Amino acid sequence: MKLLVVDDNPDILQILCSIITLFGHGVDAAGDGLEAIRLLQQDRYDVVVTDADMPRVDGIQLCRFVKAQRPDIHIIGMSGDLSALKEMENAGADFCLSKPFGLDEIRSAIEKRFRASSSPHAFAAGNSETQAG
């Protein structure tokens, strides 16, 4: 399974990419929604994990773009703002995480999207207490 992680905070971006790699999945990173759109047009992804509040193109706009252009891609939204999470759900996010979240929460969200994509690959689960957000 291949994921695209989108966040304007480079620390969160690096942590999430490292965690997803440990889970055994391919991952690309984008610093905002505009960069994510470029990557989505160039490559194939199963899941997009995106923050809500970003410059240029925010996560809500990105959700709308993904659902309009690639409805087969699952979206996991992230934000510390509950109203932004609701907006992301309304824009097409399949699942939302409130920041900060723990490793088990992101793993569970990815695993659910993994199962929904019917991929034949096995999901590797780690057992750490790392937090992102």
Task: Tell where the protein language model's regions lie, with residue ranges.
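Two-component/phosphorelay signaling modules centered on CheY-like receiver
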Residues: 10-28
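Acidic catalytic/metal-coordinating carboxylates
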Residues: 31-35, 58-62
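Active-site residues of response regulator receiver
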Residues: 51
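Receiver (REC) domain active-site loop signature in two-component systems and cognate sites
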Residues: 54
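As written
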Residues: 59, 89-97
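Hydrophobic/aromatic residues positioned on beta-strands within the core alpha/beta folds
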Residues: 76-78
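C-terminal output helix
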Residues: 101-112, 118
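CheY-like receiver
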Residues: 117-133
